[in-house]
Amino acid sequence: MRILITNDDGINAPGLAALEQVALELAGPGGEVWTVAPAFEQSGVGHCISYTHPMLIARMGERRFAAEGSPADCVLAGLHDVMKDAPPDLVLSGVNRGNNSAENALYSGTLGGAMEAALQGLRAIALSQFFGPRNYGRTDPFEIAQSHGVQVIRRILDTWPQERPDYRLFYNVNFPPVPAAEVKGLRAVRQGFREGTRFSAEPHLSPSGKRFLWIKGGDQQQRTAPGTDAAANLDGYVSVTPMRADLTADDALEALQATL
């Protein structure tokens, strides 16, 4: 198997190194693992692409490249430059430092990379590590990905539905905020929403008197509805959510069509 890897935390991120080891086991002796990751931190950039300016790309190793762009840019660089002669069988994005459950998925550069791969017609999986009081500050923050990642990805691949040209499917995987030994299993769930908590802009003054803003996230430990990703994670389960690049609200569309 030929695998392309990217992330949004950057080429030197520990989560990327963990995913590279997972990918090497998945690829097998005859396979190849290629990495094209951002040269700098790209967290929160979503699915943005840098179509207004050129993107520098540098070789960091035999099959490792750093691109000065977003995760989606890196996927494009991998498909149309680095691996143009033989495209990958699978694209993996992560392992993100922090959860991409619930509404976080809408901001995530990690998911942006996977979504771009799906739009390009490839199988893609985004992987993220949820942190909380039970696993924060551990010696190996990505131990769950290393111990469970191969099994999780293989199970997803084994159940991947037959692809349709109009159905750009990818998967969002979140590892729970517990030690690896306490993971209870996998749950297939919907994307959730953390009610009453959201991003905000917090004003501050610099020592020189200039006004600036910090963007602050909401309460990441807040439980979402039963049967959704963050709820499963807080209960100790790896969440797996199938997604596709179609943001249509079908229920609202039906109501709108009935009145227009």
Curated annotation (Swiss-Prot):
Q: Which Pfam families match?
A: SurE
SUPFAM superfamilies assigned to the protein according to its UniProt record, in alphabetical order: SurE-like
| Catalytically driven reaction(s) | a ribonucleoside 5'-phosphate + H2O = a ribonucleoside + phosphate
Using the UniProt record, name the top-level EC class of this enzyme in a single word: hydrolase
Keywords, in A-Z order:
Cytoplasm, Hydrolase, Metal-binding, Nucleotide-binding
Give the cofactor binding note: Binds 1 divalent metal cation per subunit.
Which cofactors does it use?
Answer: a divalent metal cation
Q: Does the keyword Nucleotide-binding apply?
A: yes
* Localization, UniProt: Cytoplasm
Q: Which domain of life is it from?
A: Bacteria
Indicate the transmembrane segments per the record: none
For binding a divalent metal cation, which residues are annotated in this chain's numbering? Answer: D8, D9, S43, N96
* Keyword Hydrolase among UniProt keywords: yes
Entry's Gene Ontology molecular function annotations: 3'-nucleotidase activity; 5'-nucleotidase activity; exopolyphosphatase activity; metal ion binding; nucleotide binding
Q: What's a GO cellular component annotated to this UniProt protein?
A: cytoplasm
Function statement:
Nucleotidase that shows phosphatase activity on nucleoside 5'-monophosphates.
**Xref: NCBIfam families:** PRK00346.1-4, PRK13931.1, surE
Question: What family is this?
Answer: Belongs to the SurE nucleotidase family.
Protein name per Swiss-Prot or TrEMBL: 5'-nucleotidase SurE
Query: What is the organism of origin for this protein?
Result: Ruegeria pomeroyi (strain ATCC 700808 / DSM 15171 / DSS-3)
Q: Which taxonomic lineage is given here?
A: Bacteria, Pseudomonadati, Pseudomonadota, Alphaproteobacteria, Rhodobacterales
